[in-house]
Amino acid sequence: MPLNPEKCAFIQSVQVSSTPPSLGAGAVLIPIDVIQEKTMASLAEIFQSFDPSSPFNAPENWLQGRTVYGGLTAALALHAAMQAGGSDLPPLKSAQITFVGPAMHEQIFKPTVLRQGKSVTVMTTDCFSSAQLALHMTMVFTASRDSRILHDYSQRPAVSQPDDYSLWDAGPHAPNCAHNFQKRPAGGALPFSGATDPELLMWVRHDEAQGIDPIVALIALADALPPASITTLTAHVPLSTITWTLDIVNAPAPDQWFLLKTSSHVAAGGYSLQDMEIWSESGELVLRGRQTVAIFA
C-alpha cells in the first residue's frame, strides 16, 4: 500500500523534513509516528534503558550534526564508571575529557578503575565508535574531609530568576540536540550575532531528566551552550570540541534551572579557549570548566 507523503517525513542522511522534495534514488518515505517512536527519546528515557555493558545507539534527537552530542557521551561515560565503581564510590570531583574522534554509530563504553584509595578513586572510561576510540574520560571521585582551609571567591553574575527571562528558540539551523533543553538568555550575546564580547549567559534546564543521578544530569547539560566564540560570527560554521576539563564545586540539586556562563578568552589559529561556570538557582557555584574548541572559520 503506498504511503501518504503528508503523513511521512523525508529522510536523507540525518535531515528530516515534513514536506518531501523531489524524491531521488536515496530517498525513503517513513511514517512520522514510526520516526518519533524509534528515533526520539528524552534523557530520562535514555538512562532508563542504558546498559553500559551493551552497545548504545543514540536517538536522532541527540545528534549534533553527524555525531552524538558530546555532553550525552560524557554523561554516559560517567554513568558507566559509576556503575563499575560500585556503591562505595564517592562523588565525582573532577574530570578530563578528550574527544578523540567522531561518535557516529553505536557506542561501546569500557570503564576502568586505575586506583582506589581511602578518599580518592581514579577511573577512566573509553568510548568506542566503529571500533575507533571516540572519547577518553579520566575521572577523580573524592570523599570530603575535615579541613581548616575554607574560602569561596566565586561571584555569580547579577541576574534575575529564570522566569523573568523569555525562552529562546535556537532556530531551524541548530543541531538536533539543542532542542532537548530549555534556554532563557540572561545577558551576554547570542550565537552568530556579530558581538564584540564573546560571552554567553543563559538559564538552562533539561526538558526531562527525572530519575537520573544529579551529577550525571549536570554533565549532560553542561555542554548545552555552543562555544562562546561563535557570538562574534554572523553565519554558521563547523565546530568541534577537542578537550573539556571540569570540576564539581558543589553537589547539584535535581531537576532545576542552572545558570550557564561561557566566555572565550583567547581565539587564534582556528582554536578557541573558553571558560565555563555553572550556578544553581539558589546561587551556588556547582561546576567550573574549560574547553578547547576547533573553529573552522
Which stretches of residues belong to each language-model region?
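Residue-identity detector for glycine
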Residues: 24-26
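Terminal targeting signals and extreme-terminal segments of soluble enzymes
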Residues: 32-297
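Low-complexity, intrinsically disordered or signal/transmembrane-proximal segments
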Residues: 12-15, 36
